From Swiss-Prot:
One Gene Ontology term from the biological process aspect of the record: 3-phenylpropionate catabolic process
Protein function: Component of the naphthalene dioxygenase (NDO) multicomponent enzyme system which catalyzes the incorporation of both atoms of molecular oxygen into naphthalene to form cis-(1R,2S)-dihydroxy-1,2-dihydronaphthalene. The beta subunit seems to have a structural role in the holoenzyme.
Keyword ATP-binding appears in the UniProt entry: no
Gene: ndoC
Keyword Oxidoreductase listed: yes
Protein name: Naphthalene 1,2-dioxygenase system, small oxygenase component
Amino acid sequence: MMINIQEDKLVSAHDAEEFLRFFNSGDEALQQEATTLLTREAHLLDIQAYRAWLEHCVDSEVKYQIISRELRSASERRYQLNETMNIFNENYEQLEVRVAHQLDPQNWGNSPKVRFTRFITNIQAAMDENEDLLHIRSNLIVHRARRGNQVDVFYATREDKWKRGEDGARKLVQRLIDYPERTFQTHNVMIFM
């Protein structure tokens, strides 16, 4: 199956390429491995075991990026600018700083304790042709509750790359989170997606 981006003008070249990658992959074992990786990772993040998440799920060479795409119609665009904007563009050291901040007893944002629930859906998995990289695309909903009246819900699409290490375990080497809002409707974005 092919997507003709000349005819389907709303489909970007990147999206067409990613669709084709996952459409041609029919490996059930790979799909199960991807689902297991993501649900274990979500569990660690839900219970706020951030150091364990860094140690067991995240590679030291990780690129962790949250972007927002242009949401205006083509007729409203007056200038040729990037259609994406970085919200976060972090490496392992920066993730370590964020984890340390979350675990700091002085962090007022965690008193009272914040509760998280993550829903990961539409998981698709495919192997990279040239490398031992597992590509995983998924949709994510994060529900964050603090006190009775502070509830935030985040929706996003994630494109991950997981690499198998020397110990045989896969770790996250790249995560691109496509956040569909240009302006956050939440108190803050101090979460890991």
